[in-house]
């Protein structure tokens, strides 16, 4: 049974007034969720910004997309997450990743370790955070963290627990995500620490097929219960689908045909975009679509047609 479609809007780059107004408008338009990335750029800090969005709305879910594990100790992070779930009356989704943006690490003076080390550290964080958010005792003596105890109140209030999202684009990360997460973010690989042509070339249909195989390797029998998410880096309602793709594809280091086949680009009329998203679910199981705030209004008819189906 496929997962129902839902859609999220990124609040990245918005000031405080625009952030809450955009969250309220997203809720009115039928979007499931608002998100914030986790970077030292011109944007609200993710957990504070999402708390504001949650308190300004009534049904909208909130998702940090995604928190870089290296920036926070897992027990303190679990405390923040539990509080946000309680304040939002159970509307939190937790997105975690291994961290990637070189400039963040350099600015903060945090060691930008190898991808393998960062993923091992993330795996330990997950093994600490998941039971803490369930109200369970943790006894963990690992390579990176030593934790003993239970999380004090407030605990999460969400029925069934707080959904965990892990996102990435390479084998170790997606295998871990398949084994541990409820929601899997299928991303272009960003091991270079920057978004460049290599990321575009890792966003094609062929690469997505490989990534789904890695998720399946980690998930085993639980794969069919997972929710798969994609982030749209190009989203445009247009009657000139091929022309837009031909113009944008060279910036990504791929062909127009590859751009139109990627689950990270969506260009076309409303009807074409609806058909394309349905095709992604049929082909890959992707049902959770994330886009930027500037595309929110244009894609509202797509959201209205597909949400919950």
Question: In which residue ranges do the predicted regions lie?
Answer:
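Active-site-adjacent structural elements that line small-molecule/cofactor binding pockets in enzymes
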Residues: 1-309
